Amino acid sequence: MLGAKKQKAWLSDQEFAKKFGLSVVDTTDNRYELLAIPFDGTIPRFAQNVKKQRIQGEELTIYYDLQCPYVCQNIEIIKEYCTINDVPLSLIQVDTLQKAKELPCVFNNYSVFYKGNFQTVNLLDIAYVKRILKK
């Protein structure tokens, strides 16, 4: 189960899970936590590419899949804004198991990076894009 040191609205309450025996078995540099019950003694871990939540590219980069019905519309809005304003943009659709395993973050449905740094898992609007680009 994915949790966080500080509770996030989109994550299940890990305190509830801990009451049923789950415990923190791994963490990322950004304070996300992996909770599990190691039934057979093996302990799951975050992949190393997830730990730092960083990428090589400097451009605005969005990893996304189509689990949420609003993602397609959101991607088109961001793509149009970036095209009009000459903002370099990389869009990476996570549409295979291999791509999901290679993600640089704990979220496979939507994550945003800028200047190599993880920014958010929230769908972007234009105002949010402008705030990110000012960083």
Can you annotate each of these PLM segments?
Residues 89-108:
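Thioredoxin-like thiol-disulfide oxidoreductase module
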Residues 48-84:
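Local sequence-structure signature of Cys/Sec-based thiol-disulfide redox active-site neighborhoods
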Residues 6-34:
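Conserved active-site alpha-helix within GNAT-family acetyltransferase domains
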Residues 11-12, 72-76, 124:
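Generic recognition of short, well-ordered alpha-helical segments
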Residues 1:
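Conserved acyl-CoA
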Residues 104-113, 124:
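Structural micro-motif
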Residues 114-135:
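Non-catalytic, surface beta->alpha helical segment in thiol-disulfide oxidoreductase systems
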Residues 29-52:
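C-terminal "cap" of GNAT-fold acetyltransferases
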